[in-house]
């Protein structure tokens, strides 16, 4: 569900379902579900920061989860279902923390989204890739109306004319 959701956002190039930050190599879904590998089920998101920024991606993601829930999303339970943001660029930490801090006041319980550097990532089995495209009506914890929110969230803005004083300051008299 999260991969399909993220793919709806303009500026997201690719998504890949996988397993992150565990303690074995090349885990299978079955191994991850056993709960002893330390992996979280994740979605790698590659995006164009000139089209969509990290803050918007995080805010949209947070709309699809309960950020106060530990080891559970929807009907899925277990440590592999913990929520997290795993970054590959430490310069993103400030944006991640600020975005999380900004939503914290909306909740009565503490935010428990894990924020850590990505230590390892293994692509999940092909069955999990593009799951909702291959399984119309398949189980998804994300409410259907949120997919439309993702599609509209980053719509291109129409040209906005600058005010006259700004135009005078940047244009020559001939222009």
Predicted feature residues:
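Flexible coil/turn and secondary-structure edge motifs
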Residues: 1-175
């Amino acid at each position: 569900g999260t991969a399909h959701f993220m793919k709806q956002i303009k500026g997201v190039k690719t998504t890949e379902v996988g397993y992150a930050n565990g303690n074995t190599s090349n885990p299978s879904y079955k191994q991850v579900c056993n709960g002893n590998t330390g992996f979280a089920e994740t979605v790698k998101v590659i995006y164009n920061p000139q089209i969509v920024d990290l803050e918007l991606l995080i805010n949209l993601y947070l709309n699809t989860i309960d950020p106060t829930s530990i080891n559970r999303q929807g009907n899925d339970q277990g440590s592999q279902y913990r929520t997290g943001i795993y970054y590959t660029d430490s310069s993103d930490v400030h944006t991640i923390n600020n975005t999380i801090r900004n939503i914290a006041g909306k909740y009565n319980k503490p935010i428990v989204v894990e924020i850590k550097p990505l230590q390892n990532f293994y692509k999940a089995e092909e069955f999990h890739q593009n799951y909702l495209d291959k399984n119309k009506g398949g189980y998804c914890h994300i409410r259907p109306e949120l997919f439309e929110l993702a599609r509209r969230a980053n719509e291109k803005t129409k040209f906005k004319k600058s005010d006259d004083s700004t135009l005078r300051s940047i244009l020559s008299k001939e222009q």
